[in-house]
């Protein structure tokens, strides 16, 4: 009876989007923390908040979480200065509301390298912070499953 329950539970859990078991596997990747600070608003896909907000001091360095290539470095009215980096194993990291950008599209970056500075830019900002998103194979994933903030 217990074996049957366990099998049924495991079958159900593999489709559970909030389950830690649904975290994509990573081979040998060591993720850097994107900036110093505390999470002020966590990832919540149900509320369409596809990242973690990290309260930080303006001007604090924003770091690439992994080696990669900058695929977007721009300004938008809603999210202010933002930068996106493509990484190995189909990961993309997104950094929004920056005060300034230090890298351009096409630049190669190392994990832990400064790519921007924390700011308060864009209409959707709520004060100095970094809105950080992590995407894997085109789907938003909870950064807190990979990075210790």
Residue ranges and their predicted role:
Residues 1-42:
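Polar/charged, compositionally biased leader and regulatory segments
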Residues 29-149:
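Catalytic cores of peptidoglycan-degrading enzymes
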């Amino acid at each position: 009876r217990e074996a049957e329950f366990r099998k049924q539970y495991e079958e159900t859990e593999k489709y559970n989007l909030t389950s830690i078991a649904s975290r994509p596997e990573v081979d040998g990747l060591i993720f850097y923390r994107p900036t110093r600070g505390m999470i002020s608003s966590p990832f919540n896909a149900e509320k369409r908040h596809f990242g973690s907000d990290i309260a930080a001091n303006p001007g604090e360095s924003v770091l690439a979480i992994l080696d990669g290539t900058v695929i977007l470095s721009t300004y938008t009215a809603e999210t202010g200065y933002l930068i996106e980096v493509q990484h190995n194993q189909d990961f993309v990291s997104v950094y929004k509301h920056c005060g300034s950008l230090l890298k351009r599209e096409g630049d190669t970056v190392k994990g832990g390298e400064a790519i921007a500075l924390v700011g308060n830019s864009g209409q959707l900002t709520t004060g100095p912070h970094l809105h950080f998103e992590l995407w894997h194979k085109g789907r938003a994933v909870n950064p807190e499953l990979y990075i210790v903030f």
